[in-house]
């Protein structure tokens, strides 16, 4: 009596292994891709938070002017811009903050709105 596997059994086992290995590699590749996106969004959020903090230190008149600049963080150059918004309420001021890796803002990674009171603090 012969012991061992037939050629068909070996080929079937290799095909199953190849399919499962491909699936594992695709999952790992997707996880690495997601990690890069999450890292970009996190750092862009930090840049936006820094700009929000600076806006809180400005006067109401300074916040009412559109501003644009760049910041270096986590080994990359980030571009940010602030856009004042009309709220229809004299006691409330809103400013949109956008952050991008591109100077032309073709792809905005982080966008948020900051609200400021017109009473108290710096005017």
Curated annotation (Swiss-Prot):
It is found in: Cell inner membrane. SUPFAM superfamilies: Pili subunits. Its main location: membrane. One of its GO terms (biological process) is protein secretion by the type II secretion system. Keywords: Cell inner membrane, Cell membrane, Membrane, Methylation, Transmembrane, Transmembrane helix. Residues 1-4 form a propeptide. It comes from the Bacteria. The chain crosses the membrane at residues 5-25. It is a single-pass membrane protein. The modification N-methylphenylalanine is found at residue 5. InterPro entries: N_methyl_site (IPR012902), Pilin-like (IPR045584), T2SS_GspI_C (IPR003413), T2SS_protein-GspI (IPR010052). One of its GO terms (cellular component) is plasma membrane. Cleaved by prepilin peptidase. Methylated by prepilin peptidase at the amino group of the N-terminal phenylalanine once the leader sequence is cleaved by prepilin peptidase. Component of the type II secretion system required for the energy-dependent secretion of extracellular factors such as proteases and toxins from the periplasm. Part of the pseudopilus tip complex that is critical for the recognition and binding of secretion substrates. Type II secretion is composed of four main components: the outer membrane complex, the inner membrane complex, the cytoplasmic secretion ATPase and the periplasm-spanning pseudopilus. Interacts with core component GspG. Interacts with pseudopilins GspJ and GspK. Belongs to the GSP I family. This is Type II secretion system protein I. It comes from Escherichia coli.
């Amino acid at each position: 009596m012969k012991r061992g596997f037939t050629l068909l059994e070996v080929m079937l086992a290799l095909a199953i292994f190849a399919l499962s290995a491909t699936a594992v590699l695709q999952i790992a590749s997707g996880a690495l891709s997601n990690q890069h996106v999450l890292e970009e969004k996190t750092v862009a959020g930090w840049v936006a938070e820094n700009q929000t903090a600076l806006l809180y230190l400005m006067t109401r008149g300074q916040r009412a002017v559109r501003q644009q600049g760049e910041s270096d963080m986590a080994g990359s150059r980030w571009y940010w811009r602030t856009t004042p918004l009309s709220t229809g309420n004299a006691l409330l001021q809103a400013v949109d903050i956008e952050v991008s890796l591109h100077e032309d803002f073709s792809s905005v990674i982080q966008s948020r709105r900051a609200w400021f009171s017109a009473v108290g603090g710096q005017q």
